[in-house]
Amino acid sequence: MKIHLATDHAGLALKDKIKLHLTELGHEDIDHGAHEYDALDDYPDFIFPCAKAVAQDDQSRGIILGGSGQGEAMAANRIKGIRAAVYYNGPEEIIELSRQHNNANILSIGARFMSEKEIYRIIEIWFDTDFEAGRHQRRINKLDNY
């Protein structure tokens, strides 16, 4: 699967490690930046191109990172067709439900609140969980048609 990645400075080191993990899992990564550390960078500059790419290819997904992942998810969710779910720790069921009920196509991770090992585990759960459709598809259609 194609996985689009983006982060600001807060997730830069983790993004590069996630890329290696994705390769080990057999996925292709497309890196939308940041490519170098700049404490003054602005996350929308990287998140918008990533989210647009995911929106244009429904067979791909995205992983975005930031300090908390909140602003990044807000930016991604501005793009029609994107359903970004935020995770920065807590019950793993949150990740499962983001796929089962919400068909999340972007995972927004709070890099300052999770270890590398925790992030790998969450990514694998997210990849392994399918959308249930049914009554949930009706709700997704309403989001997409708004």
Predicted segments, located by residue:
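A short beta-strand-loop structural module common to alpha/beta enzyme folds
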Residues: 28-40
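Short, structured active-site "lid" loops
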Residues: 46-64
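Glycine-rich phosphate/diphosphate-binding loop of Rossmann-like nucleotide-binding domains
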Residues: 5-25
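Mid-chain, well-packed structural core segment of small domains
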Residues: 65, 70-108
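Short active-site oxyanion
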Residues: 2-3, 59-62, 81-83
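Short, conserved beta-strand edge motifs with alternating hydrophobic and charged residues
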Residues: 6, 30-33, 62-66
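C-terminal binding/interaction regions
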Residues: 4-6, 10-11, 92-146
